C-alpha cells in the first residue's frame, strides 16, 4: 500500500499545483484560439469578401428594427441582412470623372484617395438615412430612402438632392470622423479644409445657423483625431442634454515635455447657439479634459496608454450614467501595448465641475485657475435647472470671455479603480475596436467585451470580480480569426436581438455569433471551465443560458470556473457521454527518437504525463531530462530503449480538474529485428517476407525502406547521409536504364522514318507514345 499512498499524494499535489498556477497565471491567455479555417468549418463565421471595385468597409449603422446593417465603403453603400450578410443590397455612388481628374491633378492617389469614401451614415428620420462621403476631396452629402417598413424593401439614393459636405465629412479619406444626428441636426468632428489642418466640431443641418469650435486656437483643438460622439442626458430636463466627443490630440504647449498625444473627452450643450458679441456662431459651452489610462509603476512613473482608438458606451438603468469603455494603445514605437479602461460619467462630471487649466503666458506652466469664476459657470447649459438664462446668446460677456480662454480642465479623468481592466503588451497585435454586451448569468450580470485587433482577430473577454464587484479582472475566453488574411478591424457593431457580431475592415465584412457553446465540449466540467456567461450545462449538453430556465438543470460558474464543485455529481455522465479517450499505437526503433503528440483544446490547461509499463497496473509520473523532452505539442523521447515500451497517458489539468485526453501504446523494436525485416527481401530468406514481397510493387518496397531508414535508422546521423544514399541508388538505377531506353527510342525512330513518306502530303503531326 506504500506505493499507492505515494501515488495518491503525488496526484493530489499535482492538482493543487495546477490549481494555484491557474489562479495566479493564465487568465490573460485565450482559453480557446480558433483559426479562420476552424471558424469556417464550424459555421461560426460568415464573410463578405468585398467587391473588386470597392474597399474600406469602415462606416457602420445598425438598424435593429429593420434587421439591417448599413455599411459605407468606397463608392458604395450596402444594406446587409442581419440574419445573414450574404443577403445584401447595394447603392453605387461614385464621383464624376471631372472630380476624379481634378483630384488626380492635385497630386492625390487616384485609387486610394480620388474616390467617394463614405464617412457619415446616420438615421435621419423614419424613412431616410443621411450619408456623406469624401467625394474625391470634394465632400458631398445626400439622403437615402429606406421606406417606412422593413417589408418595403426600399434602398434608393436621392440623386436629385446633393449637399455640400464641408464640415460634415473630411476631404481626406485617411482622416477619422465622429458624427451624431439628433433632431435633424448633425454634430460632427472633422477636418474642414483640403489640407486637413482646420479641425473643428460642427453642428450643421437643421434650422439654425451652423456653429463650430474656435478656429486656429490650439487651446481648443490641437490637431485632433475624432473617435466618436454620444448624447448623454445631464438631468431629467432635456435642455441640459450634452453631446460628448471622444478624440485624441497633440498635447498643448507646456502640458507635456516634448511631443505627446493625449486622449480627450469634450462636451458641448445641445442648446448652445453661440455668443451674442463674442464667440458668434462658436460654441460657448465647449470644455475638454484628459482621459488617463495608465498602469502605476515603481517610483511614481506610470506607463501611459494615450492613443485612444475606440469608445463604447454601456447603458445602465440610469441613462445619465452609462459606463464608458475605451480602447487605448501606446504612443511609443519601441514599447507597443494596448489597454481597456472603464470610466464613470460621475467622474467625468466631477472633473468638468473642477478647476480650469490656466497659465499666464507661453513660458509658464499650466496651473489650476485660482481666480473668480464668472456666473453662470462656463460649460453650464442655459436652462431653468442651473440658472435663469434661456439662451447662450444671453450669457454675460465675462462668461463668454472666460470660456474662450479656458476651454481645458486642469484635472484629468481617471479610470474606475485607477487602472486598466485589461492590458496586452506581449503580443504582435494592438487593439482597434470594442463593443460590450451585458449578459445575465446564474450569479449576476457580466460585461462581455469583444475587442478587435489590427491583425483581423477578435478577443472575447469577460470581466469577473475577484473579491468584490468593484475589483474586476479580465478572463480571456476566446481569440478568433475572422478574416482570411490579416487586416485591421476598423468597425464593429453588436446586435443583441440577433445575438450576432458584425465586423468591418478594408477587405470586407464578417459576421459571427456571440456564443459558440458547443465548441467547449460535451461534458459538464468542460462547460463549467469555459466560464462563458452565455453558456451553461443544461443536463445533457453545453448550450445557451437563459435566465428563465429551471434552476435545477443549469450548471454554471463564471466567477470561479470550478467544475469540482458544480459537476462532481455528474462525473459518471461525463465519463460515458463526454470526452472519449483517444488511443494510439506507435512503433519506434531502438536508439532512435519518437514524438508523442498531445495538445489540449484549452490553452490554459496544464499537461501531465504518466507512464504504465507492460502488464503492470502501477502508473508513474514522467520526469523530463536528456532522455525525455517536453514541448507544447507533446513529448519527445530520444534514444529509445526496450524499457520505454508501454502505455503513455496524457492528462489535461485545469482549475483542479483532471481529464485524460490520450493513451499512447509505444512498441520499441530492437535494431537487429528491424534490419532483419528490412533486408530479408533482398537476401531471399523467410517465407513471410517472400509473401509480403510478392504483394508489394518495387516502388512500394523502396518507399517503405526509405521511410523507415529516415525516421528510425540508428546509424544515420544526418539527413545528408540518408539523401546521399538515396541519390547514389537512383543514379545507379538510371545508369542501367539507357540500353533499354535507347532500344525503344531506336525502334520508334525507325517507325517514324518509315511513315515520313506517307505523311509528307498531309504534314500531320505524329505524337509519340507516353512510354517514350
Curated annotation (Swiss-Prot):
Classification via Pfam families: Ig_6, Sema
Region (Disordered) location: 677-698, 729-772
Residues annotated as domain Sema: 31-514
Cysteine pairs bridged by disulfides in the record: 103-114, 132-141, 269-381, 293-341, 517-535, 650-723
Key word Disulfide bond present: yes
SUPFAM superfamilies: Immunoglobulin (SSF48726), Plexin repeat (SSF103575), Sema domain (SSF101912)
One GO cellular component, as annotated: plasma membrane
Superkingdom of this protein's organism: Eukaryota
Main subcellular location of this protein, as a coarse class: secreted
Keywords: Developmental protein, Differentiation, Disulfide bond, Glycoprotein, Immunoglobulin domain, Neurogenesis, Secreted, Signal
Induction, as annotated: General decrease in dorsal root ganglia in response to injury from dorsal rhizotomy, with the greatest decrease evident 21 days post-injury, returning to comparable levels 1 year post-injury. Decreased in dorsal root ganglia in response to sciatic nerve transection 3 days post-injury, returning to comparable levels 14 days post-injury.
Compositionally biased region (Basic residues): 729-738
Location(s), subcellular: Secreted
Expression by tissue: Expressed in the dorsal root ganglia.
Basic and acidic residues: bias regions: 677-691, 750-772
Subunit annotation: Interacts with PLXND1.
Purpose of the protein: May be involved in guiding growing axons towards their targets by forming a molecular boundary that instructs axons to engage in the formation of specific nerve tracts. Binds to neuropilin. Involved in the development of the olfactory system and in neuronal control of puberty.
Domain commentary: Strong binding to neuropilin is mediated by the carboxy third of the protein.
Record-stated family: Belongs to the semaphorin family.
Protein name per Swiss-Prot or TrEMBL: Semaphorin-3A
Organism in which the protein naturally occurs: Rattus norvegicus (Rat)
Amino acid at each position: 500500500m506504500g506505493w499507492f499512498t505515494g501515488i495518491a499524494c503525488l496526484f493530489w499535489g499535482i492538482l493543487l499545483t495546477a490549481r494555484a498556477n491557474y489562479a495566479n497565471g493564465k487568465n490573460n491567455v485565450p482559453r480557446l484560439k480558433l483559426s479562420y479555417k476552424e471558424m469556417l468549418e464550424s459555421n461560426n463565421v460568415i464573410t463578405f469578401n468585398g467587391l473588386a471595385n470597392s474597399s474600406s468597409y469602415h462606416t457602420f449603422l445598425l438598424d435593429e428594427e429593420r434587421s439591417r446593417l448599413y455599411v459605407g465603403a468606397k463608392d458604395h453603400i450596402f444594406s446587409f441582412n442581419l440574419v445573414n450578410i450574404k443577403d445584401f443590397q447595394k447603392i453605387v455612388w461614385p464621383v464624376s470623372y471631372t472630380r476624379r481628374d481634378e483630384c488626380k491633378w492635385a497630386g492625390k492617389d487616384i485609387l486610394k484617395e480620388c474616390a467617394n469614401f463614405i464617412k457619415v451614415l446616420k438615421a435621419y428620420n423614419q424613412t431616410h438615412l443621411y450619408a456623406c462621403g469624401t467625394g474625391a476631396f470634394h465632400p458631398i452629402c445626400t439622403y437615402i430612402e429606406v421606406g417606412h417598413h422593413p417589408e418595403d424593401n426600399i434602398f434608393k439614393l436621392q440623386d436629385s438632392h446633393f449637399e455640400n459636405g464641408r464640415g460634415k465629412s473630411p476631404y481626406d479619406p485617411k482622416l477619422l470622423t465622429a458624427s451624431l444626428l439628433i433632431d435633424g441636426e448633425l454634430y460632427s468632428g472633422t477636418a474642414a479644409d483640403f489640407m486637413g489642418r482646420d479641425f473643428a466640431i460642427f453642428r450643421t443641418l437643421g434650422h439654425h445657423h451652423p456653429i463650430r469650435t474656435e478656429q486656429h486656437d490650439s487651446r481648443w483643438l490641437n490637431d485632433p483625431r475624432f473617435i466618436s460622439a454620444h448624447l448623454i442626458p445631464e438631468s431629467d430636463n432635456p435642455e441640459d442634454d450634452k453631446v460628448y466627443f471622444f478624440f485624441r490630440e497633440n498635447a498643448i504647449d507646456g502640458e507635456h515635455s516634448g511631443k505627446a498625444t493625449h486622449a480627450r473627452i469634450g462636451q458641448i450643450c445641445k442648446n448652445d447657439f453661440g455668443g451674442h458679441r463674442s464667440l458668434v456662431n462658436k460654441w460657448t459651452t465647449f470644455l475638454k479634459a484628459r482621459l488617463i489610462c495608465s498602469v502605476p509603476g515603481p517610483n511614481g512613473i506610470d506607463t501611459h496608454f494615450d492613443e485612444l482608438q475606440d469608445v463604447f458606451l454601456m447603458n445602465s438603468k440610469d441613462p445619465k450614467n452609462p459606463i464608458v469603455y475605451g480602447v487605448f494603445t501606446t504612443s511609443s514605437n519601441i514599447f507597443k501595448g494596448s489597454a481597456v479602461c472603464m470610466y464613470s460619467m460621475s467622474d467625468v462630471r466631477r472633473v468638468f465641475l473642477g478647476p480650469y487649466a490656466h497659465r499666464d503666458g507661453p513660458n509658464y506652466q499650466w496651473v489650476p485657475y485660482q481666480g473668480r469664476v464668472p456666473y453662470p459657470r462656463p460649460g453650464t447649459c442655459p436652462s431653468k435647472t442651473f440658472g435663469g438664462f434661456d439662451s447662450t446668446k444671453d450669457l454675460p460677456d465675462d462668461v463668454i470671455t472666460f470660456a474662450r480662454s479656458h476651454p481645458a480642465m486642469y484635472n484629468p479623468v481617471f479610470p474606475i479603480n485607477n487602472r486598466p481592466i485589461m492590458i496586452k503588451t506581449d503580443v504582435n497585435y494592438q487593439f482597434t475596436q470594442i463593443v460590450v454586451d451585458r449578459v445575465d448569468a446564474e450569479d449576476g450580470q457580466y460585461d462581455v467585451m469583444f475587442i478587435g485587433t489590427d491583425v483581423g482577430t477578435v478577443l472575447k473577454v469577460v470581466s469577473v470580480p475577484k473579491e468584490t464587484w468593484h475589483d474586476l479582472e479580465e478572463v480571456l475566453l476566446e481569440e478568433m480569426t475572422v478574416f482570411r488574411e490579416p487586416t485591421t478591424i476598423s468597425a464593429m457593431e453588436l446586435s443583441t436581438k440577433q445575438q450576432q457580431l458584425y465586423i468591418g475592415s478594408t477587405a470586407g465584412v464578417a459576421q459571427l455569433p456571440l456564443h459558440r457553446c458547443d465548441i467547449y465540449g460535451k461534458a459538464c466540467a468542460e462547460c463549467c471551465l469555459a466560464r462563458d456567461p452565455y453558456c451553461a450545462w443544461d443536463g445533457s449538453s453545453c448550450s445557451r443560458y437563459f435566465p428563465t430556465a429551471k434552476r435545477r438543470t443549469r450548471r454554471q460558474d463564471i466567477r470561479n470556473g470550478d467544475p469540482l464543485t458544480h459537476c462532481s455529481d455528474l462525473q459518471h455522465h461525463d465519463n460515458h457521454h463526454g470526452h472519449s479517450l483517444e488511443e494510439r499505437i506507435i512503433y519506434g526503433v531502438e536508439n532512435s527518437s519518437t514524438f508523442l503528440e498531445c495538445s489540449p483544446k484549452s490553452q490554459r490547461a496544464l499537461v501531465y504525463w504518466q507512464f504504465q509499463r507492460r502488464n503492470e497496473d502501477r502508473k508513474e509520473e514522467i520526469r523530463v531530462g536528456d532522455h525525455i523532452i517536453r514541448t507544447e505539442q507533446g513529448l519527445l523521447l530520444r534514444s529509445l530503449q526496450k524499457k520505454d515500451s508501454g502505455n503513455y497517458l496524457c492528462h489535461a489539468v485545469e482549475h483542479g480538474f483532471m481529464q485524460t485526453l490520450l493513451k499512447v501504446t509505444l512498441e520499441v523494436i530492437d535494431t537487429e529485428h528491424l534490419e532483419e525485416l528490412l533486408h530479408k527481401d533482398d537476401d531471399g530468406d523467410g517465407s513471410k517476407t517472400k509473401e509480403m514481397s510478392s504483394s508489394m510493387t518495387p516502388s512500394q518496397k523502396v518507399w517503405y525502406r526509405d521511410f523507415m531508414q529516415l525516421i528510425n535508422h540508428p546509424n544515420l546521423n544526418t539527413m545528408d547521409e540518408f539523401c546521399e544514399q538515396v541519390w547514389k541508388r537512383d543514379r545507379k538505377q538510371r545508369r542501367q536504364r539507357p540500353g533499354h531506353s535507347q532500344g525503344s527510342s531506336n525502334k520508334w525512330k525507325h517507325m517514324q522514318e518509315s511513315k515520313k513518306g506517307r505523311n509528307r502530303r498531309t504534314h500531320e503531326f505524329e505524337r509519340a507514345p507516353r512510354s517514350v
